[in-house]
């Protein structure tokens, strides 16, 4: 009788199958933590705005619901003035940021200028400077009485006077320090743009200016708008620059008004 060899297959446990629940568990834990850190403070802020009492100390009661706080804010002339100043400062700063950021992007991407790497680094350098430091630095340079630029101009006999403790001063500093947002968006759009489109326009007889106006600019316009919106929103939340440059001139924006 011939002996027949039989093989026995043993199914080993699939470690990967056993650990499939780990990503879901970590995702769920992360969602819970983020919900607590974000949703809970936001909910308490909303409840506090809709009640006339402190919900943390006195508890939350439906009878305390009121829009009185919103009416006080809406009818406060100081809030309206601060809001108007914020829109002017941030709107003007956004325009300056677009001019500077677009110029830097065009020079870096579309020209053969030397030291392009240095220029590209300078284009994002303001992002590494805290707003409060930026305000103090420019106040040292542009103070109306003791500013370094004014003192140098006085010694040189140049009829030059600069005062950054003004609305144009804030707009100027805002534009310089938040131009990198426009620069990064626009430079990326210029690099990723299909050059054959501009070549086709030139072959068709379009001038460089017409090609820029009808081909290049429409293609990078979404990037410019994205940089503008981001710059504007970030400027609205900045405290350092308005506190240093606006407060001495009694120019109050929303961020400084909240802290006063």
Language-model region placement:
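Transmembrane alpha-helical segments of polytopic membrane transport and secretion proteins
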Residues: 1-31, 209
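Glycine-rich helix-loop "coupling/hinge" segments at transmembrane-helix boundaries
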Residues: 57-59, 143, 240-260
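Short coil/turn motifs that cap or connect alpha-helices
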Residues: 114, 206-207
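Glycine/proline-centered hinge or cleavage motifs at structural transition points of membrane proteins
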Residues: 204-206, 218
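Feature of multi-pass inner-membrane transport and sensor proteins
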Residues: 2-9, 194-195, 210, 247-255
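Transmembrane helix boundary and interhelical loop/hinge segments in multi-pass membrane proteins
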Residues: 63-66, 186-199, 208, 221, ...
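A short amphipathic helical element positioned immediately N-terminal to and/or at the very start
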Residues: 11-14, 65-74
């Amino acid at each position: 009788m011939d002996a027949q060899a039989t093989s026995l297959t043993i199914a080993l446990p699939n470690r990967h199958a056993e650990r499939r629940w780990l990503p879901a568990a970590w995702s769920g834990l992360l969602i819970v933590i983020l919900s607590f850190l974000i949703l809970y403070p936001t909910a308490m802020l909303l409840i506090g705005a809709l009640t006339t009492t402190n919900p943390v100390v006195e508890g939350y009661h439906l009878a305390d619901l009121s829009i009185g706080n919103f009416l006080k804010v809406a009818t406060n002339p100081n809030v309206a003035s601060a809001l108007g100043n914020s829109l002017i400062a941030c709107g003007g700063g956004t325009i300056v940021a677009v001019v500077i950021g677009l110029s830097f992007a065009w020079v870096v991407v579309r020209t053969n200028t030397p030291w392009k790497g240095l220029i590209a680094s300078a284009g994002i350098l303001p992002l590494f400077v805290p707003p409060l430091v930026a305000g103090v630095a420019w106040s040292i340079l542009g103070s109306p009485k003791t500013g370094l630029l004014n003192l140098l101009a006085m010694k040189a006999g140049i009829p030059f006077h600069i005062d950054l403790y003004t609305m144009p001063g804030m707009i100027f500093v805002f534009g310089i320090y938040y131009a990198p947002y426009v620069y990064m968006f626009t430079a990326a759009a210029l690099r990723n743009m299909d050059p054959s489109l501009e070549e086709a326009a030139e072959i068709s007889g379009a001038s460089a200016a017409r090609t820029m106006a009808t081909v290049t600019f429409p293609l990078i316009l979404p990037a410019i708008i994205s940089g503008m919106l981001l710059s504007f929103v970030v400027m609205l939340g900045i405290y350092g620059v308005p506190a240093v440059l606006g407060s001495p001139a009694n120019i109050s924006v929303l961020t400084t008004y909240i802290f006063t």
